[in-house]
């Protein structure tokens, strides 16, 4: 673990990290999030009987779109040329929840952790949005980075 924040300069002000001199490397990040709900709500999603349509397809597209827009949402995040974004949704009826996983890849000078986290988060938020008419007390939880590869800090895996 590093002992310094990279987005704070010597004067204590927030700044975007200068990556000009960094090497271009293959980078990859995986993240996950969960959304817990009543068994009946999950069944509506799984059976396709939700009145708003295919919840998983909409959440998947929202997550992909969110990864591409991460630098518009996170102020000091660099805009990146993503080469792959994947969002998968898995119903887990035994736990009354959906597990969302994301994968982001690129060849670049900075990592894609924020893009992967944003993809998983927004997919979960989209499920909430589409299902809130049926259930308002759903819980989004355990959003975390699962793995990152590439760059100076090397490989990280939970």
Curated annotation (Swiss-Prot):
Entry's Gene Ontology molecular function annotations: cyclic pyranopterin monophosphate synthase activity; GTP 3',8'-cyclase activity
Entry keywords, A to Z: Lyase, Molybdenum cofactor biosynthesis
GO biological process: Mo-molybdopterin cofactor biosynthetic process
Pathway this chain belongs to: Cofactor biosynthesis; molybdopterin biosynthesis
Active site: 129
Domain of life: Bacteria
Broad enzyme group: lyase
Pfam families listed in its UniProt record: MoaC
Catalytic activity, EC: 4.6.1.17
Positions that bind substrate: 76-78, 114-115
Reactions it catalyzes: (8S)-3',8-cyclo-7,8-dihydroguanosine 5'-triphosphate = cyclic pyranopterin phosphate + diphosphate
Similarity field: Belongs to the MoaC family.
NCBIfam families noted in UniProt: moaC, PRK09364.1
Subunit structure, as described in the record: Homohexamer; trimer of dimers.
Function: Catalyzes the conversion of (8S)-3',8-cyclo-7,8-dihydroguanosine 5'-triphosphate to cyclic pyranopterin monophosphate (cPMP).
Protein name per the record: Cyclic pyranopterin monophosphate synthase
């Amino acid at each position: 673990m590093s002992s310094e924040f990279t987005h704070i300069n010597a004067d204590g002000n927030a700044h975007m990290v200068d990556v000009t001199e960094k090497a271009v490397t293959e980078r990859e990040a995986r993240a996950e999030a969960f959304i817990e709900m009543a068994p009946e709500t999950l069944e509506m999603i799984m059976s396709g009987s939700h009145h708003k349509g295919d919840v998983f397809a909409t959440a998947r597209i929202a997550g992909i779109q969110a990864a591409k827009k991460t630098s518009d949402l996170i102020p000091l995040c660099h805009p990146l040329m993503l080469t792959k974004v994947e969002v998968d949704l898995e119903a887990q009826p035994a736990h009354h929840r959906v597990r969302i996983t994301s994968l982001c890849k690129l060849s670049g000078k900075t990592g894609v952790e924020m893009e992967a986290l944003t993809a998983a988060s927004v997919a979960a938020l989209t499920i909430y949005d589409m299902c809130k008419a049926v259930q308002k007390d759903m819980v989004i939880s355990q959003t975390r980075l699962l793995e990152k590869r590439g760059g100076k800090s090397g490989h990280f895996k939970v």
